[in-house]
Amino acid sequence: MKINQYAVVETPFEQQVHELTEIGFYDESVTDAMGAGAAAVWQALLVQAFPEYRDATPKLRELAVDNNRDVATFLQSGAPLTTEIFDAVALQLLGFTETVDYQIDQPLQAVHEFGLPLYEKRGKWDVDDVLTAWYALLTTHTAGGLQFIDDLASRGYFAKTNLPLFFNGKAMATFDTSALIKEVVYVETDVDTDEDGVRDLVRVEIVRPDTSVDVPVLFTASPYYQGLNNEANDAKLHTVDVPLSHKTPNKVRYEDIAFPGVTLPDAEQHEVVAEADEATESFKATSHVDINNYFLARGFAVAYSSGVGTRHSDGMQDTGSPEQVLSMKAVVEWLAGNRVAFTDRTSGYAVKANWSNGKVAMTGKSYLGTLATAVATTGVAGLETVISEAAISDWYQYYRDNGLVIAPGGFPGEDMDVLAELVYSRMHDAADWHRTKDQWTAFQAQTDQMMDRESGNYNAYWDARNYLPHVSDIKADVVMVHGLNDWNVKPRQVFRLWQALQTSGVAKKLYLHQGQHIYINNNRSLDFSDQMNLWLSHKLYGVANQAETQLPDVTWQANDQAETWETRQSWGQTETVALPLAGDDEMSYEDWQIESDFESYKRDFNNWRTEMLKQENDRFEVNRLVFTEAPFENDVVIDGEVTVKLRIKSSENFGLVSAMLVDYGEAQRLGATPTPLGQQIDRGTEWQPTPLVEFKLQKPTTEKMISIGHMNLQNRTAPWQVDDLVADEFVTLNLTLQPTLYRLKAGHKLGVILYGTDFEMTVRGNQDIRYTVDTVNSKLLVPFQQ
C-alpha cells in the first residue's frame, strides 16, 4: 500500500501548538502532563483519540508497542518514548493491520513504504517532539482513506458548533449535517430562450449549514439534476450505419464561420413587488455530488441548478450554448450578491443570498464540469475558482473530429440534440410539457439542422460551443481533473484547455489519472479531497495556507505501477522524434467486413476493439495495417500529442482514416475502473458515506491502447475546410491523436494500427473501400519526454 499526500502543510511549532489548542487536543490534561515528560504527554493525547469512549484509558491495553508490551505496560515501565514506539502505535491508530500490512517490530519500514508523513527523530523524545509528532499524525491518512483528524471527526470528536474551524490549512467537519437548510429560489437570467418576451427564470436548489456566519458556496451546474428522459433519449439516437460520401470542396476560412457572439434579447424583466427575508420553498434532496457533501460538513453551502430548459425553469434546452452558459452565470451572480432572484416564479418577491460570503466555486464532472469551465470563460465576478473534472472545452471535439461524426466512447448515435432530449426535463410535468411540446419539437429540428451530421464540418454552431477562444477571459483559478483512459470525454478536451491557460494569469492545477470517466475524490492512494479542501479553504475562506504553491502544478498517476502518483511542472512536449512506419513502398487495407462479422462487431464493439488491438490476428489481416517499432532499451515517456504523418489514398473519392497507438508487451496494467475496497469514507460525522476505491493491477495482457484518432480525408487542412479527394490519388495529412502521458517500459514496443471504420465511434457504412499507404513517406511523430 502507498499513500500519496500533497496537502500536508509544513507548519511552525508555535502554530502547531495553537492549532492543537483550537481543535481541543492541547488542553489542560496535556499541560498537566508536561512536568512528567514526553510519555505522559503522549498518554494524555492518546486517550483523546477515542471519542466514542468517556474514559479511553482501557484502550491503551489494546495498542501494542512491540511484540511483548502494550501501551499501558510501556507507560508503567518508564521507558523513553522514541520514533519506533510512537510509530508502532500510530500505525494501529491509522487502521493498518499488523501482520497483514506491516510487522510490529518494523514500524519505520512500514511508515516509509506507505509514504506516511509522520514525524521522525532519532533517540529519546521530549515534550515538543510529542506535540509535533501528534500534529503530524493528525494530518496523516488512515488505511481507510481519511486524514486521522477527519477519521476522528467521523467518530464524533468535534462538537457541532456550526462555526468554521481550520487545521493544517483545511476546514474541519464542525457543522451539523442533520440540520441543513434546504431552500429554492428562481434566478432571473439575461436570456429569453423560449421567446415569450420575458427573461427566463432558472430554479436553484440550495443546501447550507444552519450557522450565524456567512459561508461560501460550491455551485454545481447540472442539466441532469432535475431528471432525465431516458426513453425519449433512446428514441432520438441517430443511426450510425450510414455510408460516408464525397463532400463538395470549398475554401472556407475560420473567419467565415466564426461565431460573432451572442446578442441578448430585449426581454422584459420580472417585476420586483417586494423583498422577502428568506426563501419560502424547500425541496427533497436527491443524489448529490460527493465532494460537495464533503464540504457541507465543513462550512460550505452547496447550490445546484439545471439551467434553462429543465424542470421548474423557463426556456429551451440547447446543449452547451451561450444561452445555457449565461443562465448558469446568472446563478453565480446571485450567489455573489449581484443579481435578483425570486421566492417563486409568479409572486415577484425578491430574495437575496444574505447567508453567502459572496465567494463561489463551481464543481462537477462531465457536463457539470463543462459548464463550470464555460462559466469561467465569461469572467463573471464572484467566481473564485472552478474544479472541473472530465470536462468538455470544445463540443465539436466531443461529437465530431476532423470532419467526421464521432461518437463519445460507448455512445454511438448520440449527438447534441439527443443530449438535449435527455435533459429537457420539462417533460416530467404534464401541463408544462403540453404547453411547450410544439415549440420544443421545432427547436430540436433547428438544432438537428445546425449541428449538421451530414457533413461533420465545423461551423458557426460549433464555434459558439467552443470555449477555448475565450480562455483569456477567465479570471477564476482553475483545477482540472481528467482520465487518460477517458474515451467518452477524451483527453484532448483538458489538454487544449491546459495549454490555453499557460498564457493566462490565473493559478491552474492539473490531475491526470489512469481511469476512465470518473471522479477520483474517493481514491485511497491520493489525498485529493484534502487537496481540494486546502484549495477551497484558501480561495473561499481566505485561509493563508500557501495552497497555490503547496499543491503540485501537475499530478500524474503513473500507468506502470499501482498507487503511484508523480508530480510535474508541465504536460505536453513540443519537440517530437520521427519514427518510420515500415520499409515497404506501399501497403493496403480494406474497409469492408462480411455481413456476419459486421453485425457481430456492431453488437459488441468492445470485443471488436479487443481483437483489433492484438498484434497478430488473422481475422483482421485485410482490414488494418499494424506497424511496430523496435523494443525500447530503457523506459520512455510519451508526453503530449502523437501525430501520424501519412501519405495515403482511397479507392473512392471519399474516405476516412483511424489510428490507434498501442503499447505492445506483456505486463500487468492498471484497470481503468477503480476497485471498491470494501470500506466506506464518511464525509462528515455519519454523513453521506462513499465507497473507498483504488486502481488495481489486472491480469497480464500483451497490449494496451494508449491513444486514438480519426480524420475525414477531405478535412486534411481544417475541420471547416473541405479539400478535394480524387480516387486512387495520394494525399498527405497529419493525424494528431489524443494527447497522453504514458510510460513505455523497457522491452516493450510502440505500435500504431491504421484502419477505417471504428465500430464504436465512426459511422459504419461497411463500404468496399481500399486504402493504400505510402509507408516510405509516412512516419510517426512522438513527443518523448526530454
Describe the predicted segments one by one.
Residues 502-518:
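Catalytic histidine neighborhood in serine/cysteine hydrolases
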Residues 168-217, 223-226, 231-234, 239-276, ...:
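N-terminal cap/lid segment of alpha/beta-hydrolase-fold proteins
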Residues 296-312:
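Conserved alpha/beta-hydrolase
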Residues 474, 480-482, 486:
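Short beta-strand/loop motif that positions the catalytic acidic residue
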Residues 211, 316-323, 330-361, 366:
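Gly/Ser-rich "nucleophile elbow"/oxyanion-hole loop immediately N-terminal to the catalytic nucleophile
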Residues 5-161, 172, 229-281, 285-292, ...:
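Accessory cap/linker subdomain of secreted extracellular hydrolases
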Residues 487-495:
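Conserved alpha/beta-hydrolase "acid-adjacent" motif
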Residues 4-12, 279-280, 546-786:
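Glycine/threonine-rich phosphate-binding loop and adjacent beta-strand/alpha-helix elements that clamp
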